[in-house]
Curated annotation (Swiss-Prot):
Gene this protein is translated from: rplQ
A single GO BP: translation
GO MF entries: structural constituent of ribosome
Pfam families with a match to the protein in the record: Ribosomal_L17
Record keywords, A-Z: Ribonucleoprotein, Ribosomal protein
Subunit-structure text: Part of the 50S ribosomal subunit. Contacts protein L32.
Annotated transmembrane regions: none
GO CC terms: cytosolic large ribosomal subunit
UniProt source species: Vibrio atlanticus (strain LGP32) (Vibrio splendidus (strain Mel32))
Signal peptide: none
InterPro entries hit by this protein: Ribosomal_bL17, Ribosomal_bL17_CS, Ribosomal_bL17_sf
Name recorded for this polypeptide: Large ribosomal subunit protein bL17
Amino acid sequence: MRHRKSGRQLNRNSSHRKAMFSNMASSLVRHEVIKTTVPKAKELRRVIEPLITLAKTDSVANRRLAFARTRDNEVVAKLFNELGPRFAARQGGYTRILKCGFRTGDKAPMAYIELVDRPAAEEAAE
């Protein structure tokens, strides 16, 4: 029975899920918008929101915690230098999920997940 077990399995083992969400979080921080399936986008919120909250207070310990979750120095630098100050006044809710139809191969529901308060110049990047 799966009573009180939170999070989606997504037909992957735990190490695959952990690596996938680490990579997706890094991509979202780097590009500020990514296209993925709706269930993955909803689970990615649970990974990226605590990272941005962590980036609001810049310390060596917080940078090491962020690096442990993303394994990318560029992403950690952008988190603490750009995203932390940008979302300093916001109390959570840093991401937005926009549904964008279905994938052609298997009709999986697709969505864009993006950071709110994104600069207007980057909206044409995706």
